[in-house]
Every structure is written in structure tokens, then in C-alpha cells.
Amino acid sequence: HPKEQESFLRGEKMFFFKGGPYDFACATCHGVDGQRIRLQDLPNFQKADNAQRAFTTWPAYRVSQGAMRTMQWRLLDCFRQQRMPELEFLSPASIDLITYMGVKAKDGAMDAPAIKR
């Protein structure tokens, strides 16, 4: 659908856009192999199997928080960790980024709800 394609392209632009005080992009952590934060391996969304494994396991129960969380919440928290401006819940930007990630995870089987640290 043309609107979905437009959303994907905006999400892709956002995924690679660098900004904030650390000049990070989503791709800084999720666009290459071998990235980790503390003990957590980070998925490379440029590889379908990585994207599928990551995207299809949300919503998830976050043990550290004792709560179910959505992919959109995960993006909000990632933006916070990057010191980026707050990504508004249900904003067009958040929907575009989720659309991009969902397309990258195409053909993955849902494996939710999952349990995350």
C-alpha cells in the first residue's frame, strides 16, 4: 500500500538519522553485528533473522520492571537511553519506525509474549 511504503521510507530515514548529544542513530547499535549493552546482545536489524528474532518477541514481560511492555515502549526507552528528544507514544514518528522494523522482520513468526531481562 502506498501509505505503508511512505511510512517505511520515513522509518528508514529515522533509523539511520544521527542526533542527540551522542550523535547516535538506531543504526549505531542495531545496524551492525556484535554490539552489546552490558550483557545484552543487540540485534542487527539489517539482517532478517536478527530483526525477526527481536521484533516478534514483543510485547514482553520485563522481569526487571515486573510489567508487560510493548515494542513502542521499548522504542521510547531506547530514545531515553540515547538522550534523544522524547518519542511521543502513538506519534507518526513512532509508527513509522515500528513500520520500518516490522518490514525488516517480514516473514518472522510471532513469539510473543516473551520474557526479557
Model-assigned labels for residue ranges:
Residues 1-12:
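Short, charged low-complexity linear segments at domain edges
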Residues 4, 16-117:
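Electron-transfer interface patches adjacent to heme c in soluble/periplasmic c-type cytochromes
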